[in-house]
Amino acid sequence: MQTTFFKQKSNYWRVFALCFFTAVLLFAPHCIVDAVAGGGYFHYAGDFNDQQINFYQYANAFVKNGGSFSWATDLGSGFVNSYSFYLLGSPFFWLSMVVPARLMPWAMVPLLCLKMAVAGGGGYLWARRWVRDETWSMLAGCLYAFSGFSIYNIFFNHFLDVVALFPYMLAALDDAVIDDKKGAFPFWVALNLVDNYFFFAGQAVFLIIYFFCMAAGRRYELGLRKFARLAWETALGCACGCVLLLPAGLSLLQNPRTIDPFSGYGYLFYGKSQQYGAIFYSTLLMPDAPYFKDLFQEGILKHTSLTAYLPLVGVAGGLAFCRARERHPFTYVLKVCVACAFVPVLNSAFYALNSSYYARWYYMPILVLCGATCYLLSRPALAEQRLPRALRLTTFLTLTAVVFAVVPGKDDDGNTVFGVLDELARFWAIFGMTMLGIVIFALLWHFCRRKRRWGAILTAAVLGFSLLYGSLHLSLTKYAQWDVDSNLIAETYDSVEDVAAALPDDAFYRIDAYGAHNNLGLWFNRSCLQFFNSTVAPSIMAFYPEVGVKRDVNSKPDAENYALRGLLSVRYTLVAKDKETEWTDKDLPGWQRTGETDAYALYENENWVPMGFTYDCYVTADQLERVSEEERAQILCRAILLDDDQISAFGSLLEPLPDEELTNRSEDAYAADCAARRAAGVAAFTATDTGFTAKTAYDTDELVFFSVPYDDGFSATVNGEPAAIEKVDDGLMAVYVPAGENEIEFTYHTPGLKVSACVSAAAIAVYGVYLLGIIIKRKSQPGSKR
């Protein structure tokens, strides 16, 4: 059947404009601050500064230049797998391709405003079916666009892509099941999948919950035929959008961060009791900065997106709705989601049962909460009956947070203190803003609820309050790191030309950084040891821990691990000038100051070993395990690590490393090892957009080592003939070459991309035929309104 709300004039573009210009007003003051005192474009904190700005700038240039292998990504990684989680499937990223790469930092705020506008419009489109009143449906969209989840995740930026697109898929599902509309659902499934495969896994779980709750609430009534068509459209949409899924899946299966299952009680209970308190208050208080802990100090709280706050109205409308409409599907959905939030294994179901805690799926029940709130408010009699009590309960529960500021305790010296909070001022700001919202809502309810334009008044108040609390959140997050990030632009964007002029371009080499910001390699288009990206080549994750470097979300080898720099062909370290004294105090061997830029002192590595060299000896895994992880790099400068099969194949080319050499780890020995590796270097090495080439001219057969992360996507040829690639040193590469002059070529093709692209292309063709069939059928039924 065709529902009546579609006959009403859509206010989509009004909601879009309201959300867009509210976002403009939200960011404008902070953009002005950055223009005047921050060095230029808007920068924020943490991931936004260290990842999102430079990812967008770098990916923009990389896509336009073409290629498959990114040398500037850590030690080198496949471009598709490194950036598909962050931006490569995002329609907002592809829209930004009209902007020159050099101007991308200035495009970040307009893109954020656009995402919030798209989110608001999508929330409105989904809500208007259920709310059945245009004004209140518009409010639902605005609440969704400026929820605590949206404001919090400005920090991560690309999470907002998911927030923006999800409501359209949910609305298309409703249309397909309730109104028997065909054709739209596969499109939105495909777009959400290609946008972000990680979040899509959670969306699939939520859609299943939503579907069964709708069926249980008798809003979804479908027979076998309609169910089969829905299954067909779902599969078709997944096939259309799988272009990045297979490559990502093949990579993630090798990534240790994605394989972290629960055990025992971990399935049922969080390890810290305070986690439950943090989840509970996430619906009541506006969110704190992502990198702070406020009310609770124990548990996994930072960077988890743990917030379900709605501006001004809070959770009161949702509580009242659930009491008033106990058998409504929204009530079922919200109750199931609450259960999921408090049970670890259910929470992790949105992340393929990974035991790492995140709340990054909350935007989906938040959308339902917005719909439930506006459903209640659009029915005056129902709201009059249920809302006051829920508002009083919400007020009381919010006030209980004060306990954390006054509860008595003891400090480290045994003195009596009040409160368990580290930053009282920050807490009172958050608590005060939250209570201000409750008071404003209560006053508006008391004085305006019977006015004819009550919905418009409340919408204006929600948008106005979103500016207030959103600006407070931005300020708490941004300016708490002002001293750290005030030189961000000077060390990155403004230093591109200076660094390019200061560094020689006579050979391939890596750089390192000390006391500087993350991901300098992306700005300067060079491989840099300090790198912040969760989805780099999996072999990097395997290699670094074996040489004493923790590798989780980023690579940060300590400067004291100086031998690692020789092994990985690091020629220069860029030392931030305000950290130069700290650097020189370390007195690391082999570094000489050779120049400077406005932001950096340049130190050259006297023990630099150009990329590509051979060894005289090999070392076994058993031998290497006798050496502490932090000192293994020095042994690997002396001998290549081979497994038993490789020793059988290449043992005749190399001598086994004597055991006494395992203890010879002096600075002089390191310098001698580097000199020996330089002498055994390849004749030429050239990095390309698809891998690299090298030339050799050895007198004997050799196993040539390259400190490039091993990847199944690489294929190698020697003199045009296919050659086997050896995985050595727990994650790097080597290839056998015969004596004499040889040309080596390593070419990278993203594993699975060709297959997934073919599947997507075929599915899109099928989808086109499917749409054509729908159109022809409609035209053959002139009386149909569909």
Enumerate the predicted regions with their spans.
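Hydrophobic alpha-helical membrane-insertion signals
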Residues: 5-81, 480-499, 503-518, 522
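Membrane-embedded helix bundles of polyisoprenyl
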Residues: 23, 113-129, 135-217, 229-249, ...
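Active-site lumenal/periplasmic loops and adjacent helix-entry segments of GT-C-fold
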Residues: 29-167, 191-195, 278, 289-301, ...
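Periplasmic/ER-lumenal interhelical loops and adjacent helix-loop junctions
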Residues: 46-59, 91, 226-227, 234-324, ...
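Extracytoplasmic/lumenal acceptor-recognition loop(s) of multi-pass membrane glycoenzymes
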Residues: 81, 85, 462-487, 499-568, ...
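Contiguous transmembrane helix-bundle modules in multi-pass membrane proteins
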Residues: 180, 199, 330-492, 739-786
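Membrane-interface helix-loop-helix junctions at transmembrane boundaries of multi-pass membrane enzymes
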Residues: 220-228, 317-341, 453
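Active-site-proximal, structured, solvent-exposed surfaces of multi-pass membrane proteins
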Residues: 647-786
